[in-house]
Amino acid sequence: SEMCIRDRYKSRYWDGKIRLFNTQTGQIYVGLLDRVVQFCKDHEYTYEFKESEFYGLPFEVNEFISKEGVKDYMHSICKHSPREYQIEGVYDALRHNRKLLISPTASGKSLMIYSIVRYYVEKKQSILIVVPTTSLVEQMYKDFADYGWDVGSYCHKIYAGKERETDSQVIITTWQSIYKLPRKYFDRFSVVIGDEAHQFKSKSLVSIMGKLGDAKYRFGFTGTLSGSQTHKWVLEGLFGPSYKIIKTNELMKKGHVASLDINVLLLKHPPTRFETFEDEVQYIIT
């Protein structure tokens, strides 16, 4: 829990830092592999990859995934027409197995998540979708239904008071509801999707992702990495390299979101001291 983490910090059992490289095991998150490779190139080190029985090679690319195929698939599973950048995002995710997709508010992240979920459901994979709040659990479930899916037959919601044990292929949950659960609970999941990943607490996210040992397919979605409660490199390490799908100003130009005008009111006044906060407020507004 958050209090337990704080106690460990105060008692000096933990210095408050998340370490991406484990000096004891010599392991680093595979999502940071591109940075390791760049480090080797910069320092003229040689390197080689050894194939894993389960994961294959870390730079595995699914060549059979085509952009046209993804486009046709997204049109076939949804009554809403996907936008070009949404197709691009889903294509990039399915092609590389691991991605941190950065897409701003109102860009339609739920449609991209829905498309990825539908693809892996058809592949008979079990999927864990993790979100930061109970309202987002309900919103995601509702969005899937709005897209025309028989969501009740495939999805199960978990948050305070909800049953955690289920045979449903897709689980939508808050991270708070599952991060204390034992590793055995996570064994059946081969796909994990984190929405609004920047809102997760680092230690809790690391705990969840660390228990998902058999989850080969990992996708994080976030609107921004600025002001994140979790460092960008932690998110990339856990999910994969970041990929910016589209910017807010591009959405405005295309008419997908309302245009924004910002008027800055700059008040110039000499420095003045006040006896109370209320006096200062009255001075500012009069």
Describe the residue ranges of each PLM region.
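Walker A/P-loop
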Residues: H96-R118
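Conserved pre-motif I regulatory segment
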Residues: Y55-I102
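Conserved helix/coil segment N-terminal to the catalytic DExD/H
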Residues: A160-V191, S202-S207
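Conserved interdomain linker/interface between the two RecA-like ATPase lobes of SF2 helicase motors
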Residues: I246-T286
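Short, small-residue-biased leader/transition segments that mark boundaries at the very start
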Residues: M3-I5
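Conserved Walker A/P-loop ATP-binding site and its immediately adjacent core
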Residues: L111-S115, Y119-D146
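Interdomain "pre-motor" coupling segment immediately N-terminal to P-loop NTPase/helicase cores
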Residues: D7-E60
